Amino acid sequence: MSKLKSSESVRVVVRCRPMNGKEKAASYDKVVDVDVKLGQVSVKNPKGTAHEMPKTFTFDAVYDWNAKQFELYDETFRPLVDSVLQGFNGTIFAYGQTGTGKTYTMEGIRGDPEKRGVIPNSFDHIFTHISRSQNQQYLVRASYLEIYQEEIRDLLSKDQTKRLELKERPDTGVYVKDLSSFVTKSVKEIEHVMNVGNQNRSVGATNMNEHSSRSHAIFVITIECSEVGLDGENHIRVGKLNLVDLAGSERQAKTGAQGERLKEATKINLSLSALGNVISALVDGKSTHIPYRDSKLTRLLQDSLGGNAKTVMVANVGPASYNVEETLTTLRYANRAKNIKNKPRVNEDPKDALLREFQEEIARLKAQLEKRSIGRRKRREKRREGGGSGGGGEEEEEEGEEGEEEGDDKDDYWREQQEKLEIEKRAIVEDHSLVAEEKMRLLKEKEKKMEDLRREKDAAEMLGAKIKAMESKLLVGGKNIVDHTNEQQKILEQKRQEIAEQKRREREIQQQMESRDEETLELKETYSSLQQEVDIKTKKLKKLFSKLQAVKAEIHDLQEEHIKERQELEQTQNELTRELKLKHLIIENFIPLEEKSKIMNRAFFDEEEDHWKLHPITRLENQQMMKRPVSAVGYKRPLSQHARMSMMIRPEARYRAENIVLLELDMPSRTTRDYEGPAIAPKVQAALDAALQDEDEIQVDASSFESTANKKSKARPKSGRKSGSSSSSSGTPASQLYPQSRGLVPK
């Protein structure tokens, strides 16, 4: 049975980082004041008047920029980890704006012992506690996951594209299906697991943070402890420590996020808004519904917020005036979270404890190994009874051998048996009185015995190695408890824890004194004169008036914040309505009514996966259809042995299940012929045809030219050169009618 415990509030601490280089260069003012002793954080309005009172918030503990990592761990987180080691569930998560130091608080700086965060310090704490424990067995497992754009990814898996599903069981609550878990035996191993996961985590650069976490990461450590109770039986306690590093809320105008970074920021802000709504609903006593299912982050933190867990919330803020709105929002949510009530209980004897499975498997293997050793002992006794007439000396030797064998001297036993078989083999080979066949038979028997002996030895060694491997995963403390250094370290840690507890009590007492100061002053006030009474009451009136103004300013800020949230919700609603109208328009115009009604009838909402699905059309849709049975001999139909033999002997169609009639192919007559190429190339043939072609005769009509020449000769005067002139005149038309050779044309 689980031990029930009274409800306790979520413990909330605030940590303020120092001003960074960009804020100093831009000359921003420091508007956050931290009072570590009183546990108060005050925020001044950078745009307000000089008389305006700062807004003050009180928490369980506050830490300024001078706080060390180990101080934060010893005072705030060490008691929670101690509770996990006792069997409670515990959660530590950092909340706040991007760039305020959440990852630094949770992980710190690697390689620097003084700047290690909560996660590495918790590793040392857990394994140191295990090494100092007595009469207890521990099993430590580690898992690492991230929520990136509302998708769960296993950071320790080789396949980073695989998306995991959230499931819920009545006995264990919400869990991640198929999440890998690694058994770790030391701080070095669990740090290696964390480093592998950090390499796969989504990180990006924005204007506000160079190494901004773009996903919510959860490192889960499961510690199982087995201890013998008063009833003499083993009882197992299981504690689970969730170390959550949330991505920071951010505004697009400040971070300059675009493209993929803007999509990431949208999903981050949605999940953080869902977390804020869960916190508000848990604090508000009127809420009947807690919206855990609004995001995967709130579903995973369901036990941590109002459930079976002890929770510490670290609110990280920045001191610059540039981020005053985000700082106030973070402090308001953290102030609300103080009022969340959890009901933690010790998880005793769960059904799915891996430690119990390990113990049962080790016990089974040991019983199997013991059974083998009993079989060997019985065989020795039989051999001893068979050779009992050999005298008392031999019996004494065998008893001595048995004592040695029972004293875990197994190697000597195997060696002795092997040497004995070798001697017997040698004796058979050297014995010339035996027939060759008999000798071979005896040698084979001895070889078989040696092989059986070898197999038995290998099986025993394998069982022993398996037992050692499984026992090595179970951590048992008390081995170094006598060590003086270890004892001194233990005393030192106890003193540090006492100092941290004393500081916490002093802080609580001072807070109570501050709240009761006003009541005591009112009761003890006595006035010596009317003027003194007027002065004191005027002073008190001014103080109350300043408080009234601060409350009015707080109400005004809350109203403005409410208006902004309402406007954002209205904008989201309008976008969703517009998208819904578009989908309805497409359905009405492009999808038939019958198909629409079929889809509407099949649609249902899956609450576990948080989205709509379709019922299968038939019951067998998700099952594999059964195939027709196939013949064992390769035929399409099953055939008997007689039918197969008849088919081979006689080519009859009676016993054939396929290819009953064997026909030759009926080839058609040929309708084409082979191509024959020309004897002479086509270009050469064309040139020859052109050269051998007959040319047409050219006929020239010169009658018109002759009549013209005769007329000219009659018109000329007579002279002594008649013949010459006539020859020249007659030669002129001939030169015009017939072309003359120009000789060789130059290239």
From Swiss-Prot:
Region described as Disordered: 374-412, 699-747
Compositionally biased spans, kind Polar residues: 701-710
Region annotation Globular: where it falls in the sequence: 580-747
Biased composition regions of type Low complexity, renumbered to the chain: 722-735
Segments forming domain Kinesin motor: 9-340
A single GO BP: vesicle-mediated transport
Keywords: Acetylation, ATP-binding, Cell projection, Ciliopathy, Coiled coil, Cytoplasm, Cytoskeleton, Disease variant, Microtubule, Motor protein, Nucleotide-binding, Retinitis pigmentosa, Synapse
One Gene Ontology term, aspect cellular component: centrosome
N-acetylmethionine modifications at: 1
Positions contributing to ATP binding: 96-103
Coiled coil (residue ranges): 346-579
Disease note: Retinitis pigmentosa 89: A form of retinitis pigmentosa, a retinal dystrophy belonging to the group of pigmentary retinopathies. Retinitis pigmentosa is characterized by retinal pigment deposits visible on fundus examination and primary loss of rod photoreceptor cells followed by secondary loss of cone photoreceptors. Patients typically have night vision blindness and loss of midperipheral visual field. RP89 is an autosomal dominant form associated with features of ciliopathy, including postaxial polydactyly, and renal and hepatic disease.
Job of this protein: Microtubule-based molecular motor that transport intracellular cargos, such as vesicles, organelles and protein complexes. Uses ATP hydrolysis to generate force to bind and move along the microtubule. Plays a role in cilia formation. Involved in photoreceptor integrity and opsin trafficking in rod photoreceptors. Transports vesicles containing N-methyl-D-aspartate (NMDA) receptor subunit GRIN2A into neuronal dendrites.
Annotated family: Belongs to the TRAFAC class myosin-kinesin ATPase superfamily. Kinesin family. Kinesin II subfamily.
Protein name: Kinesin-like protein KIF3B
Classification lineage: Eukaryota, Metazoa, Chordata, Craniata, Vertebrata
Gene name as annotated: KIF3B
